[in-house]
Regions:
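Metal-dependent phosphoester/phosphodiester hydrolase catalytic core
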Residues: 3-167
Length: 167
């Protein structure tokens, strides 16, 4: 684990309630030291790697805070993952809704909130598998010898969406 993502992050650009992309090459989410640390960690041997982010990495189409607000940083992260790790799973939150996203062979599970549901509007995204769930939810993960089963459950423990990953 390392320092919080927001500690080094450049300012977001906001217009009329929407966050816009910051394409400034000096804009950062992690800062230089955290990027160096992350690349060193990705060079290590893992059977399976899980990366946690407070904000969504794959999602692009909503108006809220996400890695794609900093497209150069997002591309840098996705390229690092692509260059170093085949078996990677992303977890994120801070959306007050849950969803499973997939870009190429990379999956992201977003889950929140356990106690404060989001609005009921229908959200779409080109990387979204199925739909998002604005009700209270949580993520579950079961790890077996060569398979990880991960998904989203509602507050009653019912599975809303899930995926199975072999590694």
């Amino acid at each position: 684990m390392y320092k919080r993502q927001r500690y080094f992050r450049s300012n977001l650009i906001k217009v009329s309630g929407d966050y816009l992309q910051n394409k400034n090459p000096d804009a950062t989410i992690l800062g230089y030291d955290q990027w160096q640390w992350l690349e060193q960690e990705l060079n290590k041997d893992f059977d399976f790697l899980i990366i946690f982010s407070s904000i969504q990495i794959l999602a692009e189409d909503h108006e809220y805070e996400k890695w794609s607000n900093f497209p150069l940083e997002r591309d840098k992260l996705l390229n690092l993952i692509d260059n170093y790790k085949d078996n990677t799973l992303l977890f994120s939150g801070d959306r007050h809704r849950a969803g499973i996203y997939k870009k190429n062979n990379l999956f992201e599970i977003t889950a929140s909130s356990m106690n404060k549901p989001g609005s009921s509007f229908v959200e779409t995204d080109k990387y979204l598998i199925g739909k998002t769930y604005p009700q209270e939810n949580f993520v579950f993960m079961e790890v077996f010898e060569k398979t990880i089963y991960v998904g989203i459950k509602d507050m009653y423990g019912n599975t809303l969406n899930s995926i199975s990953l072999n590694y």
